[in-house]
A protein has these predicted regions:
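Ser/Thr/Gly-rich low-complexity blocks that favor extended beta-strand/coil architectures
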Residues: 2-3
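Fold-core signature of tandem repeat domains
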Residues: 7-10, 14, 18-23, 30, ...
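Compositionally biased, intrinsically disordered low-complexity regions
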Residues: 18, 44-47, 75, 127, ...
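Single, functionally critical "micro-switch" positions that shape active/binding sites
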Residues: 25, 82, 174
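Short, flexible domain-boundary/linker segments around small modular repeats
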Residues: 27-56, 84-108, 136-166
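Conserved small/polar residues in nucleotide/adenosyl-binding loops
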Residues: 170-176
Length: 176
């Protein structure tokens, strides 16, 4: 497994091409390794075009699309952060090219129970919600989610902006 620091060291040993099978590092470092790709076969540089790549820091849809061009090997994302629609778009990238199946997810725009369920179907990692808006029953359902090992992660609401819809005067009077 190679990191950017390892790759720079390996590349300094030769004027030929270094071929990588596995790379695990932050997005910016993997991108920097990709920039070392030689312009012709066998030339000085680093070839990761067939490498299995794991990106360790949170990435957006734009970064996921960029990373998908780094290699014909599988790109594994450990963490993703973006709007709901963009997270769904990341998951729509064919899973033999790029996967977020076990990624920690942070959704940055407003979601509800239905959207949280969609995200839980896309990853076994924990999901952090920045904003949620739904009725009391659905919010309670989201709050009740727990880790189901190998199936779904927890849904984290501790830092969320929460909006409760469909609150009636009767509900408010009942709690006085």
């Amino acid at each position: 497994i190679s990191t950017f620091a390892d790759v720079i060291k390996l590349n300094s040993y030769t004027n030929g091409e270094v071929t990588l099978d596995k790379v695990t590092d932050k997005f910016a470092n993997v991108q920097a390794i990709h920039r070392l790709t030689p312009t012709e076969d066998g030339a000085d540089g680093v070839d990761l075009t067939a490498a299995l790549i794991t990106i360790t820091d949170p990435v957006s849809l734009d970064q996921a699309n960029t990373a998908n061009d780094f290699s014909d090997g599988l790109i594994t994302l450990n963490s993703v952060i973006d709007s709901f629609d963009n997270l769904i778009a990341i998951d729509a990238i064919p899973s033999d090219q790029l996967t977020m199946a076990n990624a920690a997810v942070q959704v940055t725009d407003e979601v509800n129970l239905s959207k949280v369920n969609d995200l839980r179907a896309d990853t076994t990692g924990n999901i952090t919600v920045d904003e949620i808006k739904d009725n009391k029953v659905n919010l309670a359902a989201v709050n009740a989610f727990v880790v189901e090992e190998g199936v779904a992660g927890d849904v984290i609401l501790s830092e969320s902006d929460i909006t409760v819809t469909a609150v009636s005067y009767t509900h408010l009077r009942a709690h006085e």
